[in-house]
Design a protein with these regions (language model features):
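Cell-envelope/glycan interface and biosynthesis
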Residues: 30-187
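Secretory targeting and sorting signals
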Residues: 6-32
Length: 187
């Protein structure tokens, strides 16, 4: 009878590092309410967006203009086609190596260890954000729309623990592969 309590406990313990990293990410990189320390250290030239800021896929900022042209075009077309249902916003696109390195360091501090941090934040040497081949999309309704329709544009959700993270993975109209469990599992 003690067995049913154990899985729930494991689930709670495994959720804690995820919650810490998500709180960090929300506070620093891809969501509203980024930390002021990150704001002081980075600029829009690094792909950094200020606290609570999102951008349109059509904005003229490095987080968008430094995206791979094919990805940028696919995201712009998807946003245009989705606009009757949802206003698709980008919370993070291209990032400088310097910003990506700092995000990983801060996620490691927030989660308590590098292994948990790497489930959500890759290092600059392997990050798709650094190469301009990934975008983080908000709001959740836009993520839901892209999960359903993104393959029409070649856009697929990359990680099951990051519903907001999309990459150009298949040819338009293809079938998206199942998302990897997390960034660590994919790398």
């Amino acid at each position: 009878m003690g067995t049913p309590a154990r899985p729930g406990r494991r689930r709670s313990l495994s959720i804690l590092p995820c919650a810490l990293v998500l709180a960090f990410l929300t506070g620093c990189s891809s969501g509203p309410g980024r930390s002021t320390s990150a704001a002081a250290a980075f600029s829009v030239a690094d792909g950094y967006l200020a606290a609570g800021e999102t951008v349109s896929p059509f904005d003229d900022v490095p987080a968008i203009t430094n995206l791979d042209p094919a990805l940028r075009s696919a995201v712009q077309q998807a946003a245009q086609d989705a606009k009757a249902r949802v206003d698709m916003r980008i919370s993070s696109g291209w990032r400088s190596e310097r910003l990506q390195r700092a995000l990983l360091e801060q996620a490691t501090t927030a989660s308590g260890n590098a292994e948990d941090a790497r489930r959500f934040v890759r290092g600059p040497e392997t990050s798709s954000h650094v190469t301009g081949r990934a975008v983080d999309v908000l709001p959740t309704r836009a993520d839901d729309w892209l999960i359903q329709h993104g393959s029409d544009y070649g856009l697929c959700q990359s990680y099951s623990n990051e519903m907001w993270h999309f990459e150009l993975t298949v040819t338009p109209g293809g079938t998206c592969p199942a998302p990897a469990a997390d960034a660590e599992a994919d790398g």
